[in-house]
Design a protein with these regions (language model features):
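Ligand-binding "clamshell"
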Residues: 61-73, 219-220, 235-255
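A bilobed periplasmic-binding-protein/Venus flytrap-type ligand-binding module shared by bacterial periplasmic
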Residues: 14-19, 76-98, 102, 111, ...
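Bilobed "Venus flytrap"/periplasmic-binding protein-like clamshell domains
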Residues: 1-20, 143, 177-191
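Ligand-site clamp/hinge motif
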Residues: 9, 16-62, 189, 201-203, ...
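Ligand/substrate-recognition segments at binding pockets and active sites
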Residues: 156-231
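Immediate post-signal peptide segment of exported/extracytoplasmic ligand-binding proteins
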Residues: 23-27, 93, 140-174
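Structural transition elements
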Residues: 119-158, 179-186
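Extracytoplasmic/peripheral linker and loop segments enriched in polar/acidic and small residues
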Residues: 109, 148, 201-212, 239-258
Length: 258
């Protein structure tokens, strides 16, 4: 297909007469832009669209087992990760380790997200079989370890409000997410609930997707969601360099750890 017109709202495609593999099934194809995942699912269900991608885990059950729809699930090269800024309260490595150990990522993937996600052990997803998922996770889910790390670090609940504090300041930080992907707010709320169990007050800050990269580059976050394709070209080097290449002398502001 070739592009006839392209706007923010939709793209119109026409059959390419010179396509190498012969005639294509449709003379024209319209691709509307539907950012909200719930609206996307409703449009598919009502027949307003014939095909949709990235149906949220809460809506996928509407189409599975329904003869009117064909559901295809594939192992994605996409990864969801939380970027932790090493400034402020999260600049403490024991606090960071406690945060990670307090999060039940397997439960999020299997139950909350209905098996549409796989817990990861490394930045590269298991769909790219480099063997990273066989590595031992030093910060595996263990809320008792989280409590111990925080206690060793001097955090106590001195006023009985359920939130730890030190030097008169509560253990609190923001988690920045966007909601155009249905799973991200669900994930953030689950993290928030798990952290509260170990005495951490995590507040969710929802922003427009278009602000995410800017906030990441400027370091304007405590913890920030990223949902990104790891191998746009079949090679993960761009993804790894973008997030983990050193930020010495400000050469890579996406790396909040320096």
């Amino acid at each position: 297909y070739v592009v006839k017109s392209f706007t923010k709202e939709r793209a119109e495609m026409a059959a390419n007469e010179n396509y190498w593999d012969g005639a294509v099934p449709f003379k024209t194809v319209e691709i509307p832009s539907i950012d909200d995942p719930n609206t996307r699912a409703m449009s598919l269900q009502s027949g307003d669209v014939d095909m949709a991608v990235n149906i949220g885990p809460g809506e996928i059950g509407l189409f599975q087992g329904n003869d009117k729809f064909k559901v295809e699930e594939i192992a994605s090269l996409r990864v969801v990760l939380a970027r932790i800024n090493q400034k402020g309260v999260l600049g403490d490595d024991k606090v960071r380790a406690a945060v990670i150990s307090a999060t039940d990522r397997k439960n999020y993937a299997d139950v909350l997200l209905k098996g549409t996600f796989i817990p990861g052990s490394a930045p590269i997803p298991p769909s790219m079989d480099y063997g990273f998922n066989d590595l031992k996770d030093p910060n595996a889910y263990n809320p008792e370890r989280s409590k111990q790390l925080l206690a060793e670090d001097g955090w106590k609940d001195t006023d009985g409000d359920g939130i730890l504090d030190k030097d008169g300041k509560p253990l609190t930080f923001n988690f920045v997410v966007y909601n155009s992907r249905a799973e991200l707010p669900l994930y953030a709320e689950a993290v928030q609930a798990d952290l509260k169990k170990v005495g951490i007050d995590m507040k969710i800050k929802t922003v427009d997707y278009n602000l995410i990269d800017k906030m990441g580059q400027e370091g304007d976050y405590d913890m920030l969601i990223s949902n990104i394709v790891t191998a746009n070209t079949g090679d993960p080097i761009w993804f790894l360099a973008n997030y983990w290449h050193t930020n010495i002398n400000g050469s890579n502001p996406q790396n909040g750890s320096g």
